Amino acid sequence: MKKLLLLTSVLAWISGASAEEKPKLIVGVVISHFYPEWMDMYGNELSENGLKRVMKQGARVNVNYNYFYTQTGVDHASIYTGMLPTEHGIVSRAWYDRLRRKRQYSTQSDRYTEIGDQQADSIKSLSPDYLQTMSLGSAMKWNNPMSRVFSVAMNGDEAVLSGGSSADMAIWFSEKTGKWVSSSYYCSELPEWLRMYNTWVESDHFVNKGWMMLSDEDKSAARIRLTNHFYYDIARAKKEYNTYRVLKATPYANTLVRVLAEKLIDEERLGVDNDPDLLALNFSCLDYMSRDFTIDSSEEKDMLVRLDMDIAALVSKLDARVGKGNYTLFVTFSEMRELMPEDLRKIKVNSDYFSIFKAVALLKSYLGLVYGPGDWISDYDQGQIYLNRELIEQKKINLKEMQDKVADFMIEFEGVAKVMTAYSLTHTSFPEGVNRLVQNSFSHKRSGDVFFCIHPTWVSE
C-alpha cells in the first residue's frame, strides 16, 4: 500500500510515541475547503492550544493532490487508502452507471437501510461497496482484529469513505431529524449510548442559539443588529426550509462532530489498550460556506476561530483520556477552497462562472444537427460528459469520432482550458501535466467519454 502522506494537501501531526511504539489511538481530522492563508491572516486570533499546537509540536508536510477531481468523497477515499482514484474506484462524487442507465452516487446503496431514526426503516442508506481497495482502517484490522475503527461526519459520504470497508461504524448527521444515524451495513441498530445521546437533540441548542460572532455571544440579537456584525437566525431558517441542513453552513457543524467524537472516545473506550484504534473525523462546514462568503469576511474569520477552539478541545480530550504520547493526530485538508470570481475581480483578475448546463444544452443541439435526432448524452457532471453508447452503437457511429467532435465543440467555450477524450486516456500514458492528473482520476468503467477542465480562475456553476 502506498504511503498515506502521498495524496494529502497539507498535513501536520502530533505524536509523543517513539518510532518503535504503536500509538493506542490514531485520530484523523479532515477539513474541507480550508484556505491556508487564513493562518497568516488571523494567526493572532488563534490560541496556542489548537492549530498552532498541531503545527508547532508536530511535523508539517506540503504536498499536492496528484489527481484532477478533488471532491467530497474522492479526497477522503484517497487520504485513507493512500491510492489514486483510478485505483480505489471513487472517481467522482457520482458517476453514470451504463449498465443500469442511471446516476450512481459514490456511497449510495439499495442493499442497506438507515438506522438511528425510528421512521427510517425504509430509507435506503449508504455503504462503502464501491470502494475497491483497503483503507487505513482495513489495514489496521488486518494486522490486529481487535482494533476498533469509527468515523464521524456531517455528511454520509465523508463518514463512510473515511471509515472504509472494515469500520465498526460510520456515523453522520441526519438533515431530517438533527440526530446521528448510520447504516445497517455496520449493525442492526445504534449502540445504546448513541441512542440515549440522540434523545436530547443537541442540534436544537445551536438552532435556537443563532449564529453571531464569538465576541457577540453575550449580546442580544437586537444589539448585534445595531453594529456592523452579523447575526443569523437559524431557527427561522430551519422553520422556513424544514431541515436541519441549515446548521451545516455554520461553525456549529464542526462543534457537533467534535462533541460526538469526545463522547464516542469515552463510550467505546478508544485508545485504552495496546490494540491501536482509529477515529476519522470530518469538519465540513466550509463546504457549505465557501460560496456564500468571501475569504476575508467576518463569517469566515469567526469560523476559523471556532474551528481552532474545536481542535484545541479535541486535543485536550485526547491528552486527558488517552494520554500524551499514546495517540497520533493528523490534520489535513480536502477540496481546496475556490477563489470566487467576486474575490478575484477586486484585483482585476479575469474570472467568471462556467455553466455546464448551458454548454450541454448547446452540445445536444449540435449533436442533433450532426447525427440526427436522439438522446446523444446520457449524463454529465463535474467536468465529464457521458455519451449514449447504446444509441451510438445502434446508429453504427464510431465512438472515437463522436468523442472527438464533442471535444472540439467543448473547447470553443469561454472558460474551458482543456478537453480530453476517454479514448486518449485509455490509449496514451501521459507522464505529467493536466493530462496526467485527469488520467489519475480516470476509470474505464465509471468515468465519462469526454473530460473538460476550466481555467483556474473560473468556477463551475
Question: Which residues are covered by each model-predicted region?
Answer:
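Loop/turn elements at helix/coil->beta-strand transitions in domains of secreted/extracellular proteins
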Residues: 22-27, 57-61, 87, 145-149, ...
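Stable alpha-helical elements in mature extracytoplasmic
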Residues: 34-35, 47-51, 75-79, 132-136, ...
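His/Asp/Glu-rich, glycine-adjacent segments
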Residues: 84, 90-275, 284-291, 411-418
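Bacterial Sec-dependent N-terminal signal peptides
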Residues: 1-22
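Short, structured active-site-proximal loop/turn typified by the sulfatase FGly-forming signature C/S-X-P-X-R
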Residues: 40-88, 148-152
